[in-house]
Regions:
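Repetitive beta-architecture junctions, highlighting loop-to-beta-strand starts
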Residues: 5, 39-43, 51, 85, ...
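Serine-hydrolase catalytic core recognition
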Residues: 62-365
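Short glycine/acidic-enriched loop and turn motifs that connect beta-strands
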Residues: 35-39, 80-83
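Short beta-strand elements that form the blades of beta-propeller/WD-repeat-like
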Residues: 27-33, 72-77
Length: 365
């Protein structure tokens, strides 16, 4: 920019720039972006005089590079679905690279499920959405398997990337080895797909996200080995909001849900986040009303467990307590569990208990 006017656009394309830094000489701009794939993060060197880009991270995957002040040396930390962790040191002037760390496979010697990544269309019929499917290694002919949808769905989070095992969590792997299918999809409103993709949920949180999650459910039901009568959903924070949202708006679909630290009414949420995406309750009264899950507490049919830390300063206790009151008034019966002394998440030794609790709930129902 010069005197408030743009001189020229340096980058252009259907991808997102995640970070940018000019080198000391003023000749180059170093950026990380999703140009190669929405699932990857790579480092590029852009010549400011002509806009020419050079990719500096040759391996596929999610890279977290560190540059020297001179711009000559780089430490490249990365992983991809086949590589648990790699650290390389590169001299960008000579092109020489030395490996500093090649982490061993932490799952070596253990039975592993089948983990795959793919795309389906969003509810708009046009946008590609990326999913991760973690399922038992051997699918028996004629057998039907229960499904757990692990959901977040909100802004600034991307759950499916070309990281180690497609970013599958240890609990996903554990549950798949016990006979569950774990499904995760990044719908519209999630991160690293550009502003239009993320901003489509503005002032109407929970609407578009729900539509795209249900497209994922349609696809799951098309698989011959999925038991459509045993579909559950689990998420935390915005994912807890989405879990409750999905259970209440599609009670015939979801048998069981576990919502951790769930947002219930966005007017109770911190202004910094809530008003960024919803506007104020005064100027967007209808949007807040539509996204308030208390108004449809009477729709609950399946088994829903809400979990909350009693010291949560982010999603304050008022969220889940107000929902319990709404359920009492409407005659529905969720389950509830509190972790004393914990904040927005359950950490430390009690986290083992948390995942045992979640696992038992899905096993029981």
């Amino acid at each position: 920019m010069k005197a408030g006017k743009m001189i020229r656009q340096i980058t252009r394309g259907e991808w997102e720039v995640l970070s940018a830094e000019i080198d000391p000489t003023g000749k180059y701009l170093y950026i990380t972006s999703t140009e190669a794939s929405p699932l990857e993060v790579n480092l590029y060197r852009v010549t400011l005089s002509n806009g020419k880009r050079e990719r500096l991270t040759p391996a596929n995957g999610v890279h977290t590079p560190l540059m020297s002040k001179s711009g000559r040396y780089m430490i490249d930390r990365y992983s991809n679905h086949n590589t648990p962790r790699m650290i390389d040191f590169s001299d960008l002037k000579t092109g020489k690279t030395k490996n500093l760390l090649c982490a061993p496979d932490p799952y070596d010697g253990y039975a592993m499920p089948d983990i795959k990544c793919g795309t389906i269309k969003a509810a708009d019929g046009e946008t590609d959405l990326y999913y991760r499917l973690t399922q038992p290694a051997k699918i028996e002919t004629g057998k039907k398997y229960p499904v757990i949808v692990y959901v977040y769905g909100g802004p600034h989070v991307q759950q499916v990337r070309d990281g180690w095992k497609w970013d599958a969590r240890g609990w996903d792997i554990y549950m798949a080895n016990r006979g569950y299918i774990i499904f995760t999809i990044d719908g519209r409103g999630s991160a690293n797909r550009g502003s239009a993709f993320e901003n489509v949920t503005h002032r109407q949180l929970g609407k578009i996200e729900l539509q795209d999650q249900m497209e994922g459910i349609k696809w799951l039901k098309s698989l011959p080995y999925v038991d459509e009568n045993r579909i559950g959903v689990h998420g935390w924070s915005f994912g807890g909001f989405m879990t409750t949202n999905m259970m209440l708006n599609n009670p015939e679909t979801f048998k069981t849900g576990v919502a951790g630290g769930p947002v219930i009414d966005w007017k109770y949420y911190e202004i910094m986040y809530g008003e960024r995406y919803m506007g104020s309750p005064k100027e967007n009264a209808q949007g807040y009303k539509n996204s308030n899950l208390n108004r449809i507490a009477g729709n609950l049919q399946g088994h829903l467990l809400l979990i909350h830390g009693d010291q949560d300063p982010v999603v304050v206790w008022q969220h889940s307590l107000s929902f319990l009151k709404s359920c009492i008034q409407s005659g529905t019966y969720p389950d509830y569990f509190v972790y004393p002394g914990h904040f927005h998440n359950v950490l430390g030794p009690d986290r083992v208990h948390l995942y045992e609790k979640i696992t038992r709930y899905f096993d029981d129902y």
